[in-house]
A protein has these predicted regions:
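Short, basic/low-complexity N-terminal boundary segments at the transition from targeting/disordered tails
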Residues: 1-11, 65-78
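N-terminal "first-domain core" detector
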Residues: 1-54
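Short, well-ordered strand-loop elements centered on a beta-strand within folded domains, enriched
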Residues: 22-25, 30-31, 64-76, 99-106
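Non-catalytic recognition/regulatory regions in large multidomain proteins
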Residues: 23, 40, 48, 53, ...
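Short loop/turn segments at secondary-structure transitions that flank enzyme active sites
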Residues: 38, 63, 109
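Short, well-structured hydrophobic secondary-structure segments
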Residues: 42-76
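An exposed acidic His-Trp-rich patch
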Residues: 73-133
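Mixed-charge, glycine-accented linear interaction segment located at domain edges/termini
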Residues: 107-184
Length: 184
């Protein structure tokens, strides 16, 4: 049985040559399995913002510190560095108790039409926080490697530069904290 598995199937930049060096978020496809249910995989043919989704997932490793983080979906379709996604998303609730996290209320909205939602009603799984965290930290490592092996991004203005710095500061802080706690 697969309690929780999440993988990046592919990761790339926007296809437009005009945007390839100024795209600040990686895009691609995920495979997510929760409580033995496939939530998303290659068959869905949906493109997600990989880097911002992984930051959202990194935020979910520990109980939320503020309400703003709680209401950011786990898997975002778009939104750039501000993480202001359209309605297309994948999300689930998390309940933390001691060293256990419960994942439930999973849903996938696959268009901007509010009726295009799949609710995974039977999904309700308890796993060790360490297991949940390690899956996410592996993704974060992949995102970091992807960005490290790409040409330097072109930051068009002060706003891009500030957003970029803030994004990577938080990403790296949460990644390092998670690695120190869950891989020692």
């Amino acid at each position: 049985m697969t309690a929780f598995s999440i993988k990046i199937l592919n990761q790339n930049w926007l296809k437009s040559e005009d945007l390839s060096n100024t795209d600040l978020c990686s895009h691609g496809e995920f495979e997510i399995i929760i409580d033995n249910q496939v939530i998303v995989d290659k068959k869905d043919e949906l493109d997600w913002t990989i880097s911002t989704s992984v930051l959202s997932l990194l935020r979910s490793i520990e109980p939320y510190i503020n309400e703003e983080e709680r209401y950011c979906e786990k898997i975002l379709h778009c939104g750039q560095l501000l993480m202001l996604s359209c309605p297309i998303c994948i999300d689930w609730d998390l309940t933390y108790e001691n060293d256990i996290v419960t994942l439930n209320n999973v849903y996938k909205q696959f268009s901007i039409n509010s009726e295009d939602v799949i609710y995974f009603k039977g999904v309700n799984v308890k796993i060790e926080i360490k297991t949940y965290a390690r899956e996410i930290l592996k993704l974060a490592e992949e995102v970091k490697q992807f960005f490290d092996n790409q040409p330097t991004r072109i930051l068009c203005d002060k706003w891009d530069s500030s957003s970029w710095d803030n994004f990577w500061s938080e990403f790296n802080e949460l990644f390092t904290r998670g690695k120190d706690k869950y891989f020692t």
